[in-house]
Amino acid sequence: MHRWSQAISLGIAIAGIVAALWPRSYSRDLTGDEDPYRLFMGRRLIHFPIFWIGAALLAYVVLQATNPAWRYTQSATQWWLVRMDHIPWLPCGIDAPFTQSNEWRQVIVYTAAWLSVCSVWVGLTRRRSLRILLGIIVGNALLLVGLLAIQQFTGNHRIPWPLTAWTDYPLTASFIYHNHAGAYLALATFCAIALAVWFFDHGSRSFAKSTPASVLALAALLLVGFVFFTLSRGAILTLAVSTAILAGWFLLRWRVLPGIPGANPVIRMAIVAMFIVFVAVVFRYLDFSEIWGRWDMIATQGSREVSVHSRVLVRDAAIDMLKTQGLRGVGAGGFRYLFPEYVQNYPEIYEGGTLYWEHAHCDWLEFPIELGLAGDLLILGGAGWWIAFFVRRRAFWNALAVPLLLGCLQTVIHAGFDFPFQCPAILVTWCMIVAIAGRWIELEPSATERTEG
């Protein structure tokens, strides 16, 4: 990933946390009969466990960077690793170029995600603000869909400039790797679905004449359609499974919770009609041959299909690497440098045409390999806190939080056979969505409480 984009992401995250922590003054016009007061959000931040877990993870990665066990060395034609003296009982890393990948580059990415989560948690105090933030994510995804549509219609994947000036690879929307484009659009799809479900639910309860639910549902359908054109088979499969689970949850919720009316038949028919028109236009003007070709290879060759077989072997080599390096880790961002030592035991990997593997194509393996046992425990601790939070808050039937969490779960499943979390855009967005779901649960009563009240 490009350094400039990571620097911009970090700058936005820093600006966000500064704005979130800025003291807020409430005058008598806003407080009613109460005295004016100032609100300091730093107190809320220091009581947020994810703040401390994230800080510990960043400190851990910095410790890896300051205790390198290998040094990256390069000549005019090749590169290799040289062993270095280091403290053997501490986490270690690789002294590698910042321009390629090393612990300091990962500190930038992780800090952006950490600060973004903290900004959402302490800075957004109204549900409307959370909905606006989700709307921004959906709007950004729709802009990417528009760019992808232009690329499909023109057959030119070397747009837009200036992104093409910084890479020699064809682009899928603005992503270098088409699977990352698919994973990002699939994640944004569930943001659109979550907003549509909430507006439908809220409008039904308040007897509103109209809501944005229909527009958001069409946006979700549009995003689903263009996930296919990213040619990401992993994103398509996980999106299909997660959507089926969501449909089952929605039907069960409709039966379990009283007072949730069905959709207006006129609106339902309008959505169906617009969807039919959308499908007709897509099939009329877009070329599906590449999509069918990729799925036909899977259907006819199965696990012996070249890309699938190569990834299976890469997974086997990564498992070998995890067994020998998983205790202390090789350093955040260091997988690509040490992995060739293990690839040489699986020469069939090179039959796929890829001679250098930067990632394990399985985040479930790559993160433990890079971060080691201590880093894994920090991540699992953060995940455990979030799970306990949602269970304790009884978020099972929440109209907005559940679709968001299903979208996040979809990305986690996708990470089992690809590397979506190595893309900073996906990692930061995913972390923010989890925080948005958690903050929403805090600000909105559960569906059970509303029906009982």
Question: Positions of the model-derived regions?
Answer:
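Membrane helix-loop boundary segments at the extracytoplasmic
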Residues: 1, 177, 366-371, 402-436
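A membrane-periplasm/extracellular boundary helix in multi-pass inner-membrane enzymes
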Residues: 59, 67, 146, 151-155, ...
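Interfacial juxtamembrane loops and adjacent helix segments
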Residues: 69-100, 157-172, 292-316, 320-321, ...
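Membrane-interface alpha helices of multi-pass inner-membrane proteins
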Residues: 217-231, 410-415
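Hydrophobic transmembrane alpha-helices and their immediate junctions
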Residues: 373-403
